[in-house]
Amino acid sequence: MAENIQKWIALGDIHQSLSFVSIIPEIKEADGIIITGDITNHSPQGAVEKVWQTIYDQNPSILAQIGNMDRANVTDFLKHKEANLHLETRELAKGIKIMGVGYSIPTPFGTPSEVSEEQLGLWLDETYAKIGDYDQLILAVHDSPYNTKLDVISNGQHVGSRSVRNFIEKVQPDIVVSGHIHESSGEDTIGKSRIFNPGMASGGGYVLITLQNGKLEAALKGN
């Protein structure tokens, strides 16, 4: 007899726009919601609380992390809710672990939470070092990996993170969900890693991650 299917919805780049809550069909019955970053736009007072409550009312099982457009108070809030994923690891199911790293490399816009490639790489390595044994691994990272289908801006330039790409090449997580580059939603592969950028949540894009009979699968939805 087949095991029950467990499902997680991964999305990001909410930017305080909550229309996605009503257009993602699986949101209520999913085993959890994973948010890769950019919950707010510069984190004005009350913004993260409003986004949290709107999602929580649909599904209270949330893991989330800071993006480059969020300020440090977002991480403080998520830690208070025991939902922070940035620089953390969690076990979603037996043998299935997730690790998260938020922020982004520097942008031309001087957004609140940017770090160097070196720092991003250190964070990835340090977080992975805490993860322990696993059978399959999900990486939730705000910045998309460099030189993929997921990091191309309108002029055709690749603007993703080399550190993220290097980490994926080295560790080969089974599933990677990124974001940050709104106009480059899609999926790609790096080695055996399947990598996804669902785009802005307000566009209805998300990644449906499923676990059935011990096997992780993922599919880009809503794009």
Predicted regions and their residues:
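Binuclear metal-dependent phosphoesterase catalytic core
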Residues: A2-I5, E91-K94, V115, R162-K170, ...
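Active-site environment of divalent metal-dependent phosphoester hydrolases
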Residues: H15-V21, T40-Q45, N68-T75, I105-G110, ...
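Conserved catalytic scaffold of divalent metal-dependent phosphoesterases
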Residues: Q16, D70-S163, G222
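Short hydrophobic-aromatic micro-motifs
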Residues: I9-A10, I96-V101, I195-N197
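N-terminal active-site segment of His-dependent metallophosphoesterases
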Residues: M1-D57, D133
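Active-site neighborhood of phospho(di)ester-bond hydrolases with catalytic His/Asp-centered motifs
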Residues: A10-G12, I33-D38, I62-N68, N84-H86, ...
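Short amphipathic alpha-helical segments and helix-helix/interface helices
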Residues: V21-P25, V48-Y56, V74-T75, Y128, ...
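Short, well-ordered alpha-helix to beta-strand connector turns
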Residues: A30, N59, K81-E82, Y134, ...
